[in-house]
Amino acid sequence: MSNRKYFGTDGIRGRVGDAPITPEFVLKLGWAAGKVLARHGSRKIIIGKDTRISGYMLESALEAGLSAAGLSASFTGPMPTPAVAYLTRTFRAEAGIVISASHNPFYDNGIKFFSIDGTKLPDEVEEAIEAEMEKELTCVDSSELGKASRIVDAAGRYIEFCKGTFPNELSLSHLKIVVDCANGATYHIAPNVFRELGAKVIAIGCEPDGLNINEEVGATDVRALQARVLAEKADLGIAFDGDGDRVIMVDHEGNKVDGDQILYIIAREGLRQGQLRGGAVGTLMSNMGLELALKQLGIPFARAKVGDRYVLEKLQEKGWRIGAENSGHVILLDKTTTGDGIVASLQVVAAMVRNHMNLHDLCSGMKMFPQILVNVRFTAGKGDPLENENVKAVMAEVEAALGNRGRVLLRKSGTEPLIRVMVEGEEEAQVTEFAHRIADAVKAA
């Protein structure tokens, strides 16, 4: 990934109005992508977006660029990222494009691509698009220009797909669920999925205004969800992020249930049902408690680099079907091709109904180790903090103190100028002190 100029671990992302997220760049990106994708056959592209106000501007720019390259665009309107992957597959489009910055604030946005089979674009295609960006934009002949259309039943198609991943013999009629859509792309999808399966749904974070996506709601801030679950005496709460590829849950006591715990529940249920193929994939950030709990069940566990594309690569390498990040990206390859918050949450709720257990009890077989994450902003060009000798020395001291009862991880964010410092161990006070000691060394580097 290091030789890329524009593409990061999750497409192209940045602040709207600053390079590269400008109308001029996105128009050129649409054209370059069109030139590359036109070589492959079909000339139709699916374009979806989340609820950010900048989505209107950027989809227009993308459509202009694609049209200039001779490709037609079909718009879904606000639609979860996994829905665009699904629709790309079912419409047999050449590619799908999502305009979203996922869990980031409204003033950020991004562009990510899906291939014809609903997976992230291969590295070589992204590199070919970057190479095309360096060329001068030329427009095809007027008779060859692409057209624009709208997919009017996109939401209904995806709702039916999601419901189809929930077992027919089960019903949610006895459950009260608070659903938090982060004022994002799932706002008109997720509440309907759970209602149509019989649940009593209380919806929050379902009033997008273009500016309030992920603002004190959704998977990255579950405080409003926790409060509402307790106030409503609900059975559980489910929070999605702005583009619906992440899910975090809340049990009836208001406790947060993260991606590691969701992976544990789904893996254990797969084992019970005789449907688990191989093991489960987590990441370098996955809690040690997950690894130990799966080991006790005899379920193999492997760690991938952080990023859902790396979880997917590890699953494909191992021939396994389920993987997740603790942030709530859950990939279930027997159901879909990419992280899907709604589909993942349905599998957890199915386990609750089938086993007549609440979410709190489903998690009880896994003891979470205290894990402290500190984000340190750094300035590009000042040198690599991860190569600093003092940082290395402090990290070595902490690792020696933890021994085999904990872990230390330092890594750069794939989407922001941040160093993420993670320390995990048995004692929360000790882990917190160690994390801040390393973070201070990174700041001073």
Curated annotation (Swiss-Prot):
Catalysed reaction equations from the record: alpha-D-glucosamine 1-phosphate = D-glucosamine 6-phosphate
Say if the entry is tagged with keyword Protein transport.
no
Gene name of the encoded protein: glmM
Record-linked InterPro entries:
A-D-PHexomutase_a/b/a-I, A-D-PHexomutase_a/b/a-I/II/III, A-D-PHexomutase_a/b/a-II, A-D-PHexomutase_a/b/a-III, A-D-PHexomutase_C, A-D-PHexomutase_C_sf, A-D-PHexomutase_CS, Alpha-D-phosphohexomutase_SF
Q: According to the UniProt entry, what is the EC number of this protein? A: 5.4.2.10
In which domain of life is the source organism classified? Bacteria
Carrying Phosphoserine, the residues are 102
Per its database record, what is this protein's job? Catalyzes the conversion of glucosamine-6-phosphate to glucosamine-1-phosphate.
Q: How is it modified after translation?
A: Activated by phosphorylation.
Q: Can you name this protein?
A: Phosphoglucosamine mutase
Q: Which HAMAP family is this protein grouped with?
A: GlmM_B (MF_01554_B)
**Is Methyltransferase a UniProt keyword of this protein?**
no
Needed co-factor(s): Mg(2+)
SUPFAM superfamilies, per database record: Phosphoglucomutase, C-terminal domain (SSF55957), Phosphoglucomutase, first 3 domains (SSF53738)
| Active site: residue positions | 102
- Class in the EC hierarchy, top level: isomerase
Residues holding Mg(2+): 102, 241, 243, 245
Q: Which family does it belong to?
A: Belongs to the phosphohexose mutase family.
Q: Which PROSITE patterns match?
A: PGM_PMM
User: GO:BP terms for this protein?
Assistant: carbohydrate metabolic process; peptidoglycan biosynthetic process; UDP-N-acetylglucosamine biosynthetic process
Species per Swiss-Prot/TrEMBL record: Enterobacter sp. (strain 638)
| Gene Ontology CC | cytosol
